[in-house]
Amino acid sequence: MEAAAQFFVESPDVVYGPEAIEAQYEYRTTRVSREGGVLKVHPTSTRFTFRTARQVPRLGVMLVGWGGNNGSTLTAAVLANRLRLSWPTRSGRKEANYYGSLTQAGTVSLGLDAEGQEVFVPFSALLPMVAPNDLVFDGWDISSLNLAEAMRRAKVLDWGLQEQLWPHMEALRPRPSVYIPEFIAANQSARADNLIPGSRAQQLEQIRRDIRDFRSSAGLDKIIVLWTANTERFCEVIPGLNDTAENLLRTIELGLEVSPSTLFAVASILEGCAFLNGSPQNTLVPGALELAWQRRVFVGGDDFKSGQTKVKSVLVDFLIGSGLKTMSIVSYNHLGNNDGENLSAPLQFRSKEVSKSNVVDDMVQSNPVLYAPGEEPDHCVVIKYVPYVGDSKRALDEYTSELMLGGTNTLVLHNTCEDSLLAAPIMLDLALLTELCQRVSFCTDADPEPQTFHPVLSLLSFLFKAPLVPPGSPVVNALFRQRSCIENILRACLGLPPQNHMLLEHKMERPGPVLKRVGPVAAACPVLNKKGPVPAATNGCTGDANGHLQVEEPQMPTT
């Protein structure tokens, strides 16, 4: 069925007001206790009231590393869609779109229609969201190239599209940025010709002035700052240096060690702007997280989950979820863009290695039948710099799992990842979902005081390799669970139950009046779509899914 563009929830629990959508929602879950070696499961229920402001703001996005491959590609994508550009390629004419974006190209199921078929709507139709074509961009970069020159240097887009975008991007030029050589690879020094001078405190203040200038000059209601610059080395967390907000601000004032990304995070938080870290380093040190908590500003991270790691978070979930004991994961990458060149330095590679290696931890820990405490698969990650392949990253993976009775299963996967074309829609989703979360508040019957989401916005985990979560919260890396979290929280804002995929009405021997089937048997009730009748069976056969014809459903006796 085609995705509908608009819908309304008809329920006494949902009110569409002129300023907000208010919904009553029953959150049902379970709590588990242990008594004498026995697990006791206690169903619980909490009544929430969600309020989502309907007024969509004028939103600006500031990219740190605006002139890099990701920043120039995202800017080009929004311009190409806004201008409705098309261009010739060797395989035919292409048109601008937002493929790869969860919010713009993904759909969600609302339920079943009168024919028993699922009805889907675009993800962006669930709640009022900023239209991506309305985004306003600005940002910083250590390279002074304008965005048109940066686009040409990146070599990501077809030449015909670059030619059309050139006059629109030529006037866009990054603001000077912070360059601290010891945090990134030495090979980046050749690009560093557009720098903020002065002490760390002066650099922090300049970043804050840039944010304020962008807000006023572009007439913006909100700004979201997103780090898409180079991977930095890890910053050691030291008591008295960056362990608290007070100590971190003092460290900046005294000119002690602080990474450029942490400077941008602190500046963003102080200006009330959400900050999202798209690289693997530990930008959001404890002091930055405490500052975000004090200022009630959203932060999220770490490291865009775009290619190889996204596949891994699906495949390992499938293997372990199927009862196969994955024992070895070997991941090899080679790429030729500037990210690859920067990662050729050992300290920067170590940051990436950590974020790519932790992605399977929660899946392993979820199955104590397969894995003893402390047991985990061997996991090796290799990244090599090969300039010729440019932005077209190659990812090769080998997964070896144990089967029953001593058998083994090996999966080998080759994945060509267009690095920036995969990352750009993720950046788009991060900005749109973060802004939406800023308009959502809720309360419970037990705590009627309205509140918002925790400043560490773990709802964004679907989009990050190493997702940050509030202290004490479980880290979820399995992709299906991460997507379900976003979808079900947005459904809760409309008073809708979580999507559980049970389809129980199709599995009952004797449906009641509410769950009544459309016809007596699947074969006798073909589903209609715009192309005409099609068999209900999934393999194209009329009858059961294994190809055998169905018999008439017998009448069951009633008591």
Curated annotation (Swiss-Prot):
Subcellular location field: Cytoplasm
Pathway linked to the protein: Polyol metabolism; myo-inositol biosynthesis; myo-inositol from D-glucose 6-phosphate: step 1/2
A UniProt-annotated Pfam family: Inos-1-P_synth
Sorted UniProt keywords: Cytoplasm, Inositol biosynthesis, Isomerase, Lipid biosynthesis, Lipid metabolism, NAD, Phospholipid biosynthesis, Phospholipid metabolism, Phosphoprotein
Cofactor: NAD(+)
A GO cellular component entry from the record: cytoplasm
GO terms for biological process, alphabetical: inositol biosynthetic process; phospholipid biosynthetic process
UniProt EC number: 5.5.1.4
List of residues that carry Phosphoserine: 279, 357
Catalytic activity: D-glucose 6-phosphate = 1D-myo-inositol 3-phosphate
Binding site for NAD(+): 67-70, 141, 177-178, 188, 191, 228-231, 278-279, 303, 306, 337-339, 352, 390-391, 419-420
Principal place of residence: cytoplasm
An annotated Gene Ontology molecular function: inositol-3-phosphate synthase activity
InterPro entries: Myo-inos-1-P_Synthase (IPR002587), Myo-inos-1-P_Synthase_GAPDH (IPR013021), NAD(P)-bd_dom_sf (IPR036291)
Top EC category: isomerase
Keyword Phosphoprotein: yes
Cited function: Key enzyme in myo-inositol biosynthesis pathway that catalyzes the conversion of glucose 6-phosphate to 1-myo-inositol 1-phosphate in a NAD-dependent manner. Rate-limiting enzyme in the synthesis of all inositol-containing compounds.
Family statement drawn from the similarity comment of this UniProt entry: Belongs to the myo-inositol 1-phosphate synthase family.
Name of this chain's protein: Inositol-3-phosphate synthase 1
Organism in which the protein naturally occurs: Macaca fascicularis
